[in-house]
Amino acid sequence: MSFNTFGHMFRVTTFGESHGVALGCVVDGCPPRIPLTAAEIQRDLDRRKPGQSRFTTQRQEADQVKILSGVMETERGQVTTGTPIALMIENTDQRSKDYSDIKDKYRPGHADYTYEAKYGIRDYRGGGRSSARETAARVAAGAVARKVIPDVKVRAALVQMGPHKIDRANWNWDDVTRNPFFCPDATKAAFFEEYLDEIRKSGSSIGAVIEVVAENVPAGWGAPIYGKLDSDLAAALMSINAVKGVEIGAGFGAAELRGEDNADEMRAGNNGPVFLSNHAGGILGGISTGQAVVARFAVKPTSSILTPRKTVDRAGGETDILTKGRHDPCVGIRAVPVAEAMVACVLADHFLRHRGQNG
């Protein structure tokens, strides 16, 4: 299997499966002499790890990260050396027996059939590499990326669950840390609690929309045509499990606007142009404008539900399937820290590419 690596100058390779011994990543291209400790990486992993509320999978994983290479102790503390940084997270709470009854059946909505169609083999134990468990490694890599671009603030929030959207007038970033949904609207978070409880108890699942905002991105990152910043952001977010759509700035909403409404007008400021709106999401022509970079993505409902579903088996026979195991009733919740990590990695990559070309 190829395509386990992304990035150009800040390159991340992830490895491991849902029910394997461990998973992790190798970060190549991180500049030297950057302070980096396991505790800093752990803070991000703790936001993503499972089992923290009844609204996420009850699989209990500590997700303790180990730094295997790429750092050393100095008089300034632990810093990067410029060599590849290897990070490992052990799996400790696998229950592969939950999948033994369905190992020859293709789960609807999962990658079971497509993996087998491509490779002639698949890891049925929790989905193997197609499991969202893989994203723990991405979050670890994202923590390293944040250290490369310390002035850039990357934050994400859940802004819609099912058909229910937050009230943007109530947006408060502080509220994101005060509820289990990473929701910036405290009133809507209380509603989500009742709403998702009902869905969870029925054995079903629901989708969500996540918004990512990167502030303090200077003008000039990105490149025209095939190196566009928004193209790389879209690809990175689209690579997250269960994501089915990505938009930048006004996104699909721009199709409903007239030209005079969509184009972000400018006025002169002390340090360059001041934009009067941000429908472009902080990117024009594939290059950052200096405004906040804004992206949103849609996450489909978790495919593993407690309702019997129609499917086929490996022999081609028609059958029914009932998925066991422990699953998120709304996988969009834990996609929030994953999205931050992916955006941080892309921005760190573009920072290094910009510095390499322009000094």
Curated annotation (Swiss-Prot):
NADP(+) binds at R48, R54. Homotetramer. GO terms for biological process: amino acid biosynthetic process; aromatic amino acid family biosynthetic process; chorismate biosynthetic process. Its EC number is 4.2.3.5. This reaction introduces a second double bond into the aromatic ring system. NCBIfam families: aroC (TIGR00033), PRK05382.1 (NF003793). Keywords: Amino-acid biosynthesis, Aromatic amino acid biosynthesis, FAD, Flavoprotein, FMN, Lyase, NADP. This is Chorismate synthase. One of its GO terms (molecular function) is FMN binding. It holds the Pfam family Chorismate_synt. InterPro entries: Chorismate_synth, Chorismate_synth_AroC_sf, Chorismate_synthase_CS. FMN binds at R129, S130, S131, N241, A242, G285, K300, P301, T302, S303, S304, R326. PANTHER family: CHORISMATE SYNTHASE. It catalyses: 5-O-(1-carboxyvinyl)-3-phosphoshikimate = chorismate + phosphate. Its cofactor is FMNH2. Pathway: Metabolic intermediate biosynthesis; chorismate biosynthesis; chorismate from D-erythrose 4-phosphate and phosphoenolpyruvate: step 7/7. Belongs to the chorismate synthase family. It comes from the Bacteria. Reduced FMN (FMNH(2)). One of its GO terms (cellular component) is cytosol. Gene3D superfamilies: Chorismate synthase AroC.
